[in-house]
Amino acid sequence: MEERSKIRVGITHGDMNGVGYEVILKAFSDPTMFELCMPIVYGSPKVAAYHRKALNLQTNFSIINSAEEAQNDKLNILSCTDDELKVELGKPTEEAGKAALDALEKALSDYRDGLIDVLVTAPINKHTIQSESFHFPGHTEYIEERVGGGNKALMILLK
């Protein structure tokens, strides 16, 4: 019998100046996470490396250019932002809002194209993400409009 492929989980990096990368990097520092899924982080390898160093973590990741390149047993980082982003931890910036929206749009496109099975979103700043193409109270409403179909699912897990 052929082994079932792991679920392909798209994870947006959220506000790059917030807790998104910390949560992602710490979660995937546990190798058992890779038994559950194939993670594809939509964001910036440069920003991920910045957070990894700031948090003194050893979490390894692979840089990919498309979701099709993702590999099992690796934290795959799909670059979908400008490489010259400036991280300012804890500070709301327009640049962070644009990076959050860029990651969300790419992840939703890949979801619609069947390249990822589910989407997990890191927290965004609801003020800095506002732009000409984003006039929503938050990204949940944005996702609902973009994906459509009348099927709504939202899960919030807290520990």
Where do the language-model regions lie?
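Anion-binding alpha/beta catalytic cores of soluble intermediary-metabolism enzymes, centered on
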Residues: M1-K159
